Amino acid sequence: MSEAREVFLRARGRSFTSFNKDAESQWKGPFYFIQGADPQFGLMKSWEIGDCDYGGDEWEQEIRLTEEAVKAINKLSPKPKFFVLCGDLVHSMPGIEWKEEQEKDLKNVLQKTHQEIPLVFVSGNHDIGNAPTPETIQAYCDSWGDDYFSFWVGGVFFLVLNSQLFFDASKCPELKDNHDRWLAAQLAIAEERKCKHAIVFQHIPLFLQKADEDNDYFNIEKSLRQEILQMFLKAGIKAVFSGHYHRNAGAKYNDLDMVVTSAIGCQLGKDAHGLRVVVVTEDKIVHKYYSLNELNTNGLDQELVDLLKTK
């Protein structure tokens, strides 16, 4: 059990143990990773019956879909550098009776991911609560590893943030202060190192369609959003990958690509259950959303494969 448990606890000490910083801080050539979001075990039943608070007592559909996702990822060649899940791992909020069982079933599926593909976890509102507390954040960390951390892969700097602290930190102000100080220090590293690319993962999008859009449940509050965007631009962040919306969305803001990826689980729009493939080359970041069926059947597009061969 300890070996299986370790798969889910690689984010610790604000870093990620699968990648050695010294070995990974230099550019080595193009690579790719897989981004998924919102497997959210239990939401499909909840949504179907119109009880999103307490209706999530069944999650067979989400188990099957996540199994499809893992199967598709395991087939890919060459293998992705990692598989990141951008939050809402399960639907039950902290304190809801099915949470522990949902997490157990999700882990049973995810541990079938090929051992050479590390799993990176991002906390979402259903993982730590809409207004998280020190206790809900600690429970998440005990189960999935640190709620925020950074790591290097092939000369690219990755930041995993706890976006719920941007949304409502009223019950954990000290933890928000710690997160803010850490983020400022990481952005200073990104700016100083002038790394090949710097990329952020968080659950809640900064915005869905345009940077000055109105406040919404699915984005970050406008004045804070503008502050974060300016910080990210100054540090040279090239892309922010998120979930939360259960639909594909996003847009460019100056040089920053805000990417909103639809769900592995319940769809709230017209997208198919799917995953995003992200190719990182020396001069650009290229991404495409695939349905689970499409990725399982056909694998990567030749266009993306060709990008991986560029020098």
UniProtKB/Swiss-Prot annotation:
GO function terms (MF aspect): metal ion binding; protein serine/threonine phosphatase activity
Catalytic activity: O-phospho-L-seryl-[protein] + H2O = L-seryl-[protein] + phosphate; O-phospho-L-threonyl-[protein] + H2O = L-threonyl-[protein] + phosphate
EC number(s) recorded for this UniProt protein: 3.1.3.16
Residue ranges of the region described as Catalytic: 47-250
Named cofactor requirement(s): a divalent metal cation
Pfam families recorded: Metallophos
Residues at which a divalent metal cation 1 binds: D51, D88
Coiled-coil features, chain-numbered ranges: none
Keywords: Cytoplasm, Hydrolase, Metal-binding
Chain's role: Protein phosphatase involved in the dephosphorylation of AKT kinase family.
Family the UniProt entry places it in: Belongs to the metallophosphoesterase superfamily. CPPED1 family.
Name of this chain's protein: Serine/threonine-protein phosphatase CPPED1
Gene (UniProt): cpped1
